[in-house]
C-alpha cells in the first residue's frame, strides 16, 4: 500500500510539472508573438522575426505560419515559402497557409506553384471566391480565356452583383467574342458602379 501511495504521489508530481512546463512554454510563445506584432507595426520585420525564432518549434503550425508572413514582408521570399510549406505540411487542409504560400511564390515568379496552390484550395473549398477570382485572373493574363471564363462564371453565380466578378466575366466574354453576354454584363457593372471606366470602355468595343 505504501508503495502504491508513493507511485501515485510521483505520478501527480510529474503531471503537475508537465502542466507547468506547458504553461510556461505557452506564455513564452505568447510573449514572442506579442513582441513580433509590435515590431511588425513599427515596420521592423527583422526584429519581429528574431522574436519568433527564439521560440521556434518546427512542429508549431502557428509559428511557421507567422514566420512565413514576416519573412515575406521582410523580402526573404525563399525563406517565406519554406515556412509556409512547413505550415501546409503540418495542416494539409489549411486554406490560410495555402493562400500565404502564394505571396512568396508570386514574388519569386513561380506561377505554376501559385496556380497549383489555388487549385488545392478549390479542392478543399470549391466555392472559395478569392481562389476562383485569382486563378481566373492568372488564366486571363495568360490569354487562356476559355479556362478563365469558368472561374469568373462561378464567382458571378455565387455573387451575381459583385463588381470584380462581373467586370472580369464581362471582359472574358468579350475576349471570346460573346458580345451579347458581354454587353449585358458590362451594363450590370454600371448598375453597381455608375460611370465605371472599364465597363464603358468594354461597351465601346462592342458598339
Name what the model sees in each region.
Residues 10-18:
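Bacterial N-terminal signal peptides
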Residues 26-28, 175-207:
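Terminal, low-structured helical/coil segments at or just beyond the last alpha-helical repeat
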Residues 28-57, 62, 66-73, 103-106:
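Alpha-helical segment of the N-proximal tetratricopeptide repeat
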Residues 56-58, 90, 124, 158-159, ...:
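Structural marker of alpha-solenoid helical repeat scaffolds
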Amino acid at each position: 500500500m505504501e508503495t502504491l501511495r508513493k507511485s501515485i504521489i510521483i505520478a501527480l508530481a510529474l503531471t503537475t510539472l508537465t502542466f507547468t512546463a506547458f504553461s510556461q512554454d505557452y506564455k513564452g510563445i505568447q510573449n514572442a508573438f506579442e513582441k513580433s506584432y509590435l515590431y511588425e507595426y513599427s515596420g521592423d520585420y527583422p526584429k519581429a522575426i528574431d522574436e519568433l525564432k527564439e521560440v521556434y518549434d518546427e512542429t508549431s503550425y502557428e509559428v511557421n505560419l507567422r514566420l512565413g508572413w514576416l519573412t515575406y514582408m521582410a523580402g526573404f521570399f525563399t525563406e517565406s515559402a519554406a515556412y509556409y510549406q512547413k505550415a501546409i505540411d503540418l495542416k494539409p487542409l489549411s486554406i490560410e497557409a495555402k493562400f500565404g504560400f502564394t505571396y512568396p511564390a508570386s514574388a519569386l515568379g513561380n506561377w505554376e506553384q501559385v496556380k497549383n496552390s489555388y487549385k488545392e484550395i478549390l479542392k478543399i473549398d470549391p466555392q472559395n471566391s478569392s481562389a476562383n477570382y485569382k486563378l481566373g485572373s492568372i488564366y486571363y493574363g495568360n490569354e487562356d480565356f476559355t479556362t478563365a471564363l469558368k472561374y469568373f462564371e462561378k464567382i458571378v453565380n455565387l455573387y451575381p452583383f459583385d463588381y470584380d466578378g462581373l467586370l472580369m466575366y464581362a471582359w472574358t466574354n468579350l475576349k471570346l467574342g460573346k458580345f451579347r453576354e458581354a454587353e449585358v454584363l458590362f451594363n450590370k457593372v454600371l448598375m453597381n458602379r455608375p460611370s465605371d471606366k472599364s465597363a464603358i470602355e468594354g461597351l465601346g468595343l462592342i458598339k
